[in-house]
């Protein structure tokens, strides 16, 4: 994983989460979570996605956000009764097989090294019920001509850096999700805030841990 000290970065990250808001709303729009579903948000950070989810007309009955950084979780807003935040790692989720109807992993996969990314995707497949939906958000190329012109130079820096710039590495995880048994059903790009790629996939995997 990119060598970002999330404990040190927690306050700064909370202040810039407005740059992620458009993509978080878009992936929730594509996912359409409902009141009779259980949702897991992996790498929830300061629970920005859960805050957006709580404002939806029909939020899920149960939502769990996990993050490796207690400092990030400490910046979460008050969430609805029955929702939960836990310290946990995306590569070893502390949940039984087929525990959730919906899962999200936003601004995570592009930060992970290949082996960790495969583990995280496999864990998401494991804890999702067959037919469950996964929404991912990763950094993607900008739409505008000026942004596209500068993007190769930005990517060259991001791929060499293991600190903050690494968070701008772009990634289309579609093929890796497909290899893990997911079937892509929709994708969308957002341009305001961080240029982002939103994917929604259906879980076709029946493989449990071990």
Regions found by a protein language model. Give the residues of each.
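A short acidic, Gly/Pro-enriched loop at the edge of an enzyme's catalytic core
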Residues: 91-103
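Conserved class I S-adenosyl-L-methionine
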Residues: 1-34, 48-52
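Short glycine-centered segments of the SAM/dcSAM-binding site in methyltransferase folds
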Residues: 38, 131-133
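A short glycine-rich, Lys/Arg-flanked "PGG" loop and its adjoining helix->strand segment in the class I
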Residues: 118-130
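A short SAM/SAH-binding and catalytic strip from SAM-dependent methyltransferases
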Residues: 102-115
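Core SAM-dependent methyltransferase catalytic element
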Residues: 180-182, 186-210
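C-terminal alpha-helical "lid/dimerization" subdomain adjacent to the S-adenosyl-L-methionine
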Residues: 137-180, 185-188
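Class I SAM-dependent methyltransferase SAM/SAH-binding core
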Residues: 40-92
């Amino acid at each position: 994983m990119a060598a970002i000290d999330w404990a040190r970065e927690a306050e700064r990250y909370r202040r810039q989460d407005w740059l992620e808001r458009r993509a978080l709303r878009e992936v929730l729009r594509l996912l359409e979570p409902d009141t009779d579903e259980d949702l897991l948000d992996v790498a929830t950070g300061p629970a920005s996605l859960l805050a957006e989810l709580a404002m939806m007309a029909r939020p899920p009955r149960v939502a769990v956000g996990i993050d490796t950084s207690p400092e990030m979780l400490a910046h979460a807003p008050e969430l609805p009764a029955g929702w939960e935040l836990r310290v946990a790692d995306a590569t070893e989720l502390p949940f039984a097989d087929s525990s959730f109807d919906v899962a999200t992993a936003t601004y995570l996969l592009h930060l992970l090294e290949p082996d960790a990314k495969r583990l995280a995707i496999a864990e998401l497949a494991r804890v999702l019920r067959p037919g469950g939906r996964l929404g991912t958000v990763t950094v993607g190329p900008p739409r505008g001509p000026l942004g596209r012109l500068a993007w190769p130079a930005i990517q060259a820096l991001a791929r060499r850096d293991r600190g903050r710039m690494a968070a701008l590495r772009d990634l289309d995880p579609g093929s890796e999700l497909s290899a893990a048994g997911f079937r892509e059903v929709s994708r969308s790009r957002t341009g305001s805030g961080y240029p982002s790629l939103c994917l929604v996939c259906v879980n076709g995997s029946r493989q449990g841990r071990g």
